[in-house]
């Protein structure tokens, strides 16, 4: 699994003009699933994301975890497995097929306690980066 994690002041996701997920301060997690991923990778990713110490403490030092006063918005993102080593058109053969990816995306969202986008839908994601702080996590 790959997750692109961004610290945000706010984030939301819309499908067909309707907001399906929205958070205040917290993390936006763009999540991609590979063919070899399973439940263990989803669990490991969720543990890692929720333990990340990417929020400022009282002294302005990045050392606080998510905690109870921040939220997560998780959006499926198969394009994280896009390969552009040959040519200019990305190949997505490194991404899991939807039938394999969707249950793992659902599990990861559940474990993260996240608001979520709609798997497989064309979505509009809006966010306000905080920092910015952006991390790539691979399991």
Task: Name each model feature, range by range.
Residues 78:
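Glycine/small-residue-rich phosphate/adenosyl-binding loop
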Residues 5-13, 21:
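N-terminal intrinsically disordered, cationic/polar leader segments
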Residues 45, 75, 133:
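Residue-level signal for inorganic ion chemistry
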Residues 110-128:
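Divalent-metal-activated hydrolytic enzyme cores
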Residues 3-5, 134-135:
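Short beta-strand scaffold segments in enzyme catalytic cores
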Residues 19-69, 82-110, 115:
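Compact, glycine-rich, soluble single-domain proteins
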Residues 125-138:
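C-terminal edge-of-domain segments
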């Amino acid at each position: 699994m790959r997750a692109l994690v961004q610290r945000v002041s706010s984030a939301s996701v819309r499908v067909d003009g309707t907001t399906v997920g929205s958070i205040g301060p917290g993390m936006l997690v763009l999540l991609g699933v590979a063919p070899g991923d399973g439940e263990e990778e989803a669990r490991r990713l969720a543990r890692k994301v929720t333990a990340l110490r990417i929020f400022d403490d009282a002294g302005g030092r990045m050392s606080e975890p998510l905690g109870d006063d921040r939220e997560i918005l998780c959006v499926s993102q198969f394009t994280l497995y896009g390969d552009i080593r040959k040519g200019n058109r990305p190949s997505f053969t490194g991404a899991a097929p939807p039938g394999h990816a969707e249950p793992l995306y659902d599990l990861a969202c559940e474990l993260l306690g996240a608001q979520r986008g709609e798997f497989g839908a064309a979505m509009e994601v809006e966010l306000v980066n905080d920092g910015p702080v952006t991390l790539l996590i691979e399991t």
